Swiss-Prot record:
List of residues binding ATP: T64, P65, H66, G67, E68, G69, K70, T71
Gene Ontology process terms (BP): tetrahydrofolate interconversion
Entry similarity comment: Belongs to the formate--tetrahydrofolate ligase family.
Protein name: Formate--tetrahydrofolate ligase
Length: 569
């Protein structure tokens, strides 16, 4: 079989302007970037008032190093729905260069279920992530500069010379890190302001851009005005009295928003069979809320009969945050969920680690790992929507094990179960899955959130841990206990919680496989994201700046004299 890159290069692409017109966009609603991609102007939101489509959210079992094929299934299902004569659109996140050059690789799908050209999607796209980085770092430069000048001049002289209010920033009161779109562990904790005339020194650090609150704001905003208002609420620092200093207080919110004026527009590309795909925003699902943008979904639902999107990692991560953060804030309600699994994933979740063992038939291990799939089925079903299991088939899978798994799923809360072979067969590989999903979308459902807005903040943490993960409870560090009191006293207890934890286990501990029980979720820190509209709970050892592994992905990537990039897929 050809490589992903070769398949992408051989694709018969539609001119993006023609594809956009078929999708229902007017010429002045598209800002073209050559013939392969276009920004979609938000005026289409006003022109089309009603959402007409069914929203399908794709999630997965607990992820493993072997890859479950969630994006492959998202794109493949989109292609199959189109092949059945439906007007359909996929909505996915923009890939971060951290995973592209790290361990995961690209995020365009794979095989014959791809968004193309895949190299353009995986590297830069239309520059949205760079715009987020630039806007974020402008905020960091602005608050550091303000601290420098206020310290240098004092209150009276500062106000006299600048005409601005003295913010009285507390020593070590700056909360706003800098960001970069790479995995770079040495930047996690740094000292800034060192040296003469460089400002008061303070401890800071870098996060990956996907963890920036600005990225979450981009993904959750309804329009440009909403994004501007949210950016104004960003908490950059605290003053000596402990009060928050916002981007609006600093006077930098407008400039930060201006840097993201084009980033607020989704990017239109296409699948291998010419279905439209909107790519927008890129928050990670382990350290952020892990879903593409509200704006992209809104536009797609106004133009398509079916919209297929995905949440990052397993249903305890991106799907949970789709429901309790994205859907809560936007009012979007999915019609059905597709839960991706593989024989390999179930065996890995039983405790097997070697490729040889996982690829070999092993009925006992498959049955042991099935508990993880059943947990995820029940986890999705508790939100009140039908769940369809998609078994992503690999060449090493045996018919006997696949048939056993299909039969086992029939005894669960799942609406249906189908094989998916879109990686090798493209649109033909998920026709049965597409038909089952269409039937599921017609079922009566009552989408339900896990907890109400007015639940106490500590109770939200307990509910997420005990109901959302099956934990025995939550423990808060001394710092988290103080932060809990502060956030409640300041009136932020109504916000939803974004758990930042490992994706490699339903629990907080990546070593606990299958369906862990009896564990306590350790919350070490609570972080207010006032602009994004949620509180992040940092759990266990999760990091907001990843590091490169022993054998990073960049080792495979190169470019020839002809300009052709190799090694992305």
């Amino acid at each position: 079989m050809l490589t992903d890159m070769d398949i992408s290069r051989r694709a018969d692409l539609k001119d993006i302007a023609a594809l956009g017109a078929e999708f229902g966009l007017l010429p002045d609603e598209m800002q073209l970037f050559g013939k392969t991609k276009a920004k979609v102007d938000l005026r289409v939101q006003q022109r089309l008032a009603e959402q007409q489509g069914k929203l399908i959210i794709v999630t997965a079992v607990t992820p493993t190093p072997h890859g479950e094929g969630k994006t492959v299934t998202t794109i493949g299902l989109t292609q199959s729905l189109k092949a059945l004569g439906n007007k359909v659109c996929a909505c996915i996140r923009q890939p971060s260069m951290g995973p592209v050059f790290g361990v995961k690789g690209g995020a365009a799908g794979g095989g014959y279920a791809q968004v193309v050209p895949m190299q353009e999607l995986n590297l830069h796209l239309t520059g949205d992530i760079h715009a987020v980085s630039s806007a974020h770092n402008l905020g960091a430069a602005a608050i550091a500069s303000r601290l420098y000048h206020e310290t240098r001049l004092g209150k009276a002289e500062f106000e006299l010379q600048s005409g601005q209010n003295y913010l009285d920033i507390a020593p070590n009161g700056i909360r706003w890190h800098r960001v970069v779109d790479h995995n770079d562990r040495c930047l996690r904790e740094i000292e800034v302001g060192l040296g003469e005339n460089n400002g008061p020194a303070y401890t800071s650090g870098f996060d990956i851009t996907a963890a920036s609150e600005l990225m979450a704001i981009l993904a959750l905003s309804r329009n440009l005005a909403d994004m501007r208002a949210r950016i104004g609420k960003l908490v950059l620092a605290v003053n000596r009295q402990g009060a928050a200093i916002s981007a609006e207080d600093l006077g930098v919110a407008g400039a930060m928003t201006a840097l993201m004026a084009d980033a607020v527009k989704p990017t239109l590309m296409q699948t291998l069979n010419g279905a439209p795909c909107l790519i927008h925003a890129g928050p990670f699902a382990n350290i952020a809320h892990g879903n593409s943008s509200v704006i992209a979904d809104d536009i797609a639902l106004k133009l398509a009969d079916f919209v297929v999107t995905e949440g990052g990692f397993g249903s305890d991560m991106g799907f949970e945050k789709f429901c309790n953060i994205k859907a809560r804030q936007s009012g979007l309600a999915p019609s059905t969920a597709v839960l991706v699994t593989t024989l390999k994933a179930l065996k890995a979740n039983s405790g097997l680690t070697s490729d040889a063992d996982i690829n070999a038939p092993d009925q006992a291990r498959l049955e042991a790992g099935f508990a993880n799939l059943n947990w995820h089925i029940n986890n999705v079903a508790r939100y009140g929507i039908p769940v369809v299991v998609a078994i992503n088939r690999f060449a090493t899978d045996t018919d006997a094990e696949l048939n056993w798994l299909i039969e086992a799923v029939s005894g669960t809360a799942a609406f249906g179960c189908e094989l998916s072979e879109t990686f090798s067969q493209g649109e033909a590989g998920a026709l049965a899955l597409a038909q089952t999903v269409m039937r599921a979308c017609e079922q009566p459902s009552e989408f339900t959130l896990l907890y109400p807005d007015d639940m106490a903040l500590e109770a939200k943490l307990s509910t997420l841990a005990e109901v959302g993960y099956g934990a025995a409870g939550v423990s808060l560090s001394e710092a988290a206990k103080l932060q809990l009191q502060e956030l409640s006293a300041l009136g932020y207890a109504h916000l939803p919680v974004c758990m930042a934890k490992t994706p490699l286990s339903i629990s907080h501990d990546p070593q606990l496989k299958g369906v862990p029980q009896g564990f306590i979720v350790p919350v070490r820190e609570l972080v207010l994201n006032a602009g994004a509209g949620f509180i992040t709970a940092l759990v266990g050892n999760v990091m907001t700046m990843p590091g490169l592994g022993l054998v990073p992905g960049y080792l495979k990537i190169d470019i020839g004299a002809d300009g052709e990039i190799t090694g992305l897929g």
